Amino acid sequence: MSLIKEFKAFASRGNVIDMAVGIIIGAAFGKIVSSFVADIIMPPIGIILGGVNFSDLSIVLQAAQGDAPAVVIAYGKFIQTIIDFTIIAFAIFMGLKAINSLKRKQEEAPKAPPAPTKDQELLSEIRDLLKAQQEK
């Protein structure tokens, strides 16, 4: 089998396509959450904390020299990233919880007992006849 045919067989499997769609949607969701945190959540928190802009919070390790930019630890951006992660992780948790709940409901649904086989029906009839003879 040629490499191209193998790749087509691999890529056309449902799981690979589902995974690709999930990755694309996840990346888009990550951008939405990042914007939500940076543009909607953090400004009011900054105002509450006395006009702090979290994007600018940093510790300067070495000042800018000539063309070289300053070396900084940007802990404000790190705080925003932690909030991004927390929101995304919570959304994933809630989604998985809903999926697992649906799976449990499907698993818990009582299955109809299997119909007795012909052998079992014959044995039941023989048993009933023997009981009837013993009662006489």
UniProtKB/Swiss-Prot annotation:
Pfam families: MscL. The chain crosses the membrane at residues 9-29, 79-99. It is found in: Cell inner membrane. Keywords: Cell inner membrane, Cell membrane, Ion channel, Ion transport, Membrane, Transmembrane, Transmembrane helix, Transport. GO terms for cellular component: plasma membrane. The keyword Metal-binding does not apply. It is a multi-pass membrane protein. GO terms for molecular function: mechanosensitive monoatomic ion channel activity. Channel that opens in response to stretch forces in the membrane lipid bilayer. May participate in the regulation of osmotic pressure changes within the cell. Homopentamer. Belongs to the MscL family. This is Large-conductance mechanosensitive channel. It comes from Shewanella sp. (strain ANA-3). The gene is mscL.
